[in-house]
Amino acid sequence: MSKNENLRKKLEGNSIVKVGGAFDAMSAKLVESSGFDAVWAGSFAISATHALPDASILTMTEFFDVASNMSSTCKIPIIADCDTGYGGPSNVSHMVRKYENAGISSICIEDKTFPKQNSLLENGKNDLISEKEFVAKILAAKEARNDKDFLIIARVEALISGLGMNEALKRATAYENAGSDAILIHSKQKTPDEIFEFADSWKGSIPIVVVPTTYDSVKISDLSLHNIKMIIYANQTLRVAHLAITKLLREMINAEHISDIKEEMSTMQDLFNL
């Protein structure tokens, strides 16, 4: 079974699909070895590793290179966060062909304007393109793919932008009708209430995907009760790495020797075993 088939079958199964965020090939391998179903090649995390904001600054090629390295390293599927699709429908077509040919199993595009800002940025820019414009991108993605199991995830930002539940549901329906394989409904609330409201109101037939960065106390069992099929832990690995490296360096700069902090590090053998 191909990685693409594997991801689709898991999404159609009874268990919630767990996706771990990564920012390079090594972190992707760690996601894989920890038992996750797939890897999320997140634009926020990849941008941060370049010391850049998540604001459409890196090019498609720069994001692609990271996701491609993950794909060549891992046996589990890679889901690439492709922001707004790097342009219009023609850009989306080119992107889909390139990502699919690299063995990446899925792309996720969102209905924001370009250049985007991270959805969780306080007082950030959260303007959306029209429903019609985003439908054109989905149609282009669907037409460009060769493998029907290469998944197109449409990310709905209407709740983030303050346009409300009805607009979110209307857009999600249009995106399903255009050919998307799943709907990622995004929220920056600290509780999952509006996500649950969306899921309970959703009349579509394609799966719902969530990213519980802000409502992080939500239980997997509760997500399943609301028929949510995929959870993406988008940035936790990056945040843990940032904290651990910062802590270690602050200790090391004042250390007489480093034997006292070796328990905080992986061994050389751990890295050889990658």
Describe each PLM feature range:
Residues 2-232, 240-247:
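Alpha/beta enzyme core
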